[in-house]
């Protein structure tokens, strides 16, 4: 295929990656906005380069005219989680969308069936409809769900595969396996303190959202000409901020909102 043809072929894949990133990031944002724990830590995505596609097609003897049907990861989404349990929560979120805005074709469980190299992850192969300028096009995409520790290890391993053209020296392979085991132990240790970590993060989110709302409402008082009240609340806020008590900050926010609503009603 000519380069010009490839550029045209890959456009729907680029669109799919951007749409899927927005959707999964949206889940994370929505949960955090309502102070709920999000199993999604962050999301990335990419479309394979033409050279990578051709290399994979050559490796698996895929004819040019079957590349889009046989190579499932031209479009790739990677979802990172803090804990192993979160991976299964994300998988369930994807399954719930089956036959809605995407179709789950099959899954690959490398958590319970890790690769010989030590690779761990969970892959979901989907069919995703893209609305193009020429009508709807259904494409294949791979969603990889893994922990931060798994992702760190996989990124290093991928770089070494690229450097050694998949012929990684045995001594490095052995060290990689040991590193994979260490990453697995780290995930297990983090799971043991999961509740404490989540509670701390929730508290941070609540405090952050409360402070942001207080500042916005004080600014609003200034905008509607209530500078004296704004200055008074600013001083109270600074005093409470030093103490760091979330309950006191919430109470202050409630009072400020009441005052703002009262003054706006008179305007």
What are these regions (language model features)?
Residues 1-31, 141-267:
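An acidic, glycine-/histidine-flanked metal-binding catalytic module
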Residues 1-4, 35, 67-76:
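A short, surface-exposed helix-loop junction/capping segment
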Residues 4, 11, 71, 80-85:
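Amphipathic alpha-helical interface elements
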Residues 9, 13, 17, 50, ...:
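Generic alpha-helical secondary structure
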Residues 16, 71-73, 118:
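Solvent-exposed loop and beta-edge segments used for protein-protein assembly and interaction
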Residues 16-61:
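Surface-exposed, low-hydrophobicity interaction/linker segments
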Residues 54-55, 64-70:
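Extended, charge-rich alpha-helical segments
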Residues 68, 80-192:
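Long beta-strand-rich cores associated with HINT superfamily self-processing modules
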């Amino acid at each position: 295929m000519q380069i010009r043809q490839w550029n045209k072929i890959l456009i729907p894949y680029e669109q799919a990656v951007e749409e899927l990133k927005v959707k999964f990031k949206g889940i994370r944002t929505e949960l955090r906005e309502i102070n709920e724990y999000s199993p999604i830590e962050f999301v990335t995505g990419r479309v394979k380069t033409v050279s990578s596609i051709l290399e994979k097609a050559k490796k698996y003897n895929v004819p040019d005219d079957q590349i889009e049907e046989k190579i499932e990861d031209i479009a790739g989404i990677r979802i990172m989680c803090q804990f192993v349990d979160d991976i299964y929560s994300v998988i369930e979120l994807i399954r719930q969308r089956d036959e809605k805005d995407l179709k789950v074709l099959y899954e690959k469980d490398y958590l319970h069936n890790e690769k010989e190299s030590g690779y761990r992850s969970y892959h979901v192969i989907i069919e995703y409809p893209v609305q193009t300028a020429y009508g709807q096009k259904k494409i294949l995409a791979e969603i990889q769900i893994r922990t931060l520790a798994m992702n760190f290890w996989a990124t290093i391993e991928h770089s070494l595969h690229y450097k050694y053209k998949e012929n990684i020296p045995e001594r490095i392979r052995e060290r990689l396996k040991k590193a994979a085991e260490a990453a697995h132990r780290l995930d297990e240790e983090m799971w043991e303190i999961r509740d404490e970590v989540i509670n701390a993060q929730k508290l941070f989110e609540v405090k952050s959202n409360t402070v942001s709302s207080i500042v916005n409402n004080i600014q609003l008082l200034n905008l509607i000409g209530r500078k004296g009240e704004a200055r008074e609340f600013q001083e109270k806020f600074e005093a409470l901020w030093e103490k760091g008590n979330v309950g006191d900050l919430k109470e202050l926010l409630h009072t400020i909102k009441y005052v703002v609503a009262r003054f706006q009603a008179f305007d």
